[in-house]
A protein has these predicted regions:
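Hydrophobic alpha-helical segments at protein termini of multi-pass membrane proteins
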Residues: 1-209
Length: 209
């Protein structure tokens, strides 16, 4: 049995100390790192509860429950941040990526502790794949919210649309992982390639301007 709340406390403790030492300028980054890990912890409990209530098998829990719960949980702190602080577009995107990155980091650490770290090649691909998938979902939601929340008429519909896109991407990734075999490695490579392609296209557009 993995006591993920103990892992959470161990990982959050140095972040809290660093947040106190770095000052207000970097406080937002550390706070949203802690928030990202916190929503990952809560997502694990909610996933387990819903899978038990719905009597879902492993595939249904992985492909149907987990993507919805996890993407909604990652969205909630962003919506709170938008409603309370009304940040600029760049800060919205950076915050979404920070939450997603912390979420993926905590998830990977829990996976390593539960399943062991003896298979380097598998852990290497999984670390990059899962991290890139969560960051890609963060890019989609964060970049989209930065645009949608500048337009009052688009706030609600845009937020739900972005959430749906992130859930779909997450569900496809989880389905490929659950299928196993070559599809599993396709799933690990796909988000990395999409992030790389997005960065390359952004670089080319900036050079054209």
């Amino acid at each position: 049995m993995t006591y993920i709340e103990n892992i959470f406390l161990c990982m959050v403790s140095p972040l809290l100390v660093a947040a106190l030492c770095m000052g207000r300028r970097h406080l937002r980054f550390f706070l949203f790192c802690i928030v990202g890990m916190g929503v990952c912890l809560l997502s694990a409990y909610i996933n387990t509860f819903l899978a038990s209530v719905c009597q879902a098998d492993a595939l249904a829990a992985t492909a149907e429950i987990a993507p919805v719960v996890e993407e909604m949980m990652k969205l909630l702190p962003l919506v709170f941040y938008l409603l309370v602080f009304e940040p600029e577009g760049d800060k919205i995107k950076a915050t979404a990526i920070t939450v997603a990155l912390a979420f993926a980091t905590f998830e990977n650490v829990c996976y390593l502790i539960q399943n062991g770290a003896d298979r380097f090649s598998f852990i290497f691909f999984r670390g990059f794949g899962t991290g890139a998938m969560h960051v890609l979902c963060g890019l989609i939601v964060g970049g989209g919210l930065a645009y949608a929340w500048q337009r009052t008429w688009l706030k609600i519909a845009g937020t739900w649309g972005l959430l749906g896109a992130a859930i779909t991407l997450h569900a496809v990734y989880n389905l490929l992982i659950a299928y196993g075999g070559a599809a599993q490695y396709v799933a690990y490579a796909l988000p990395v390639l999409l992030v790389a392609a997005g960065r390359l296209s952004t670089f080319r557009l900036s050079r054209m301007k």
